[in-house]
């Protein structure tokens, strides 16, 4: 019976890890496109295109995107540590975001037992949105330009199942 449980846990882990987005290596063409693209700052989750919010919902594993539950606005309270003061607060908080005519770059922190910082790049149009690349930043980055540079240089690590 112990062997069956171990096999079940192993299979479940494999399924869960495969269902999450993996950091994609940027092609040379996409890297150059992002370098040259003009991005405008987005200061709120509600300022992101609906498709990008849907993409975040998929990354977070949410059934229905709820700003109050899934990600806090910049500077708002969230569950930054495993010492939960208010379980109603979201586990994530937006730090910065920027969008161009066809891409959005989202940078947020994720609380819990360890505070981590995550980056997600989405290609978006009014018709469709797709996750392009992203991962865990090696440390807190100071500016959205630093976030873009981390993405372009390939210094992001795999976020695994924890987005």
Language model: regions and residue ranges:
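Positively charged n-region of N-terminal signal peptides that target proteins for export
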Residues: 1-5
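Bacterial N-terminal signal peptides
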Residues: 6-17
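Flexible low-complexity loop/turn motifs enriched in small/helix-breaking residues
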Residues: 19-102, 135-163
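Short beta-strand elements that form the blades of beta-propeller/WD-repeat-like
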Residues: 103-109
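Solvent-exposed loop/turn segments at secondary-structure junctions
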Residues: 110-113, 138-139
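Structural motif
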Residues: 114-120
């Amino acid at each position: 019976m112990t062997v069956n449980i171990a096999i079940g846990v192993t299979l479940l882990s494999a399924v869960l890890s495969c269902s999450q987005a993996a950091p994609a290596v940027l092609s040379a063409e996409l890297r150059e496109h992002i370098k040259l693209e003009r991005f405008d700052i987005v200061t709120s989750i509600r300022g992101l295109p609906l498709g990008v919010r849907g993409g975040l919902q998929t990354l977070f594993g949410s059934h229905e995107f709820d700003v109050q539950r899934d990600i806090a606005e910049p500077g708002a309270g969230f569950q930054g540590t495993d010492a939960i003061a208010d379980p109603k607060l979201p586990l994530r908080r937006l730090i910065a975001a920027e969008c161009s005519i066809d891409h959005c770059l989202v940078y947020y922190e994720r609380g819990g037992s360890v505070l981590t910082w995550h980056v997600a790049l989405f290609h978006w149009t009014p018709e469709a949105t797709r996750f392009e690349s992203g991962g865990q930043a090696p440390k807190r980055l100071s500016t959205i330009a630093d976030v873009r540079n981390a993405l372009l240089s390939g210094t992001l690590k795999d976020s695994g199942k924890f987005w």
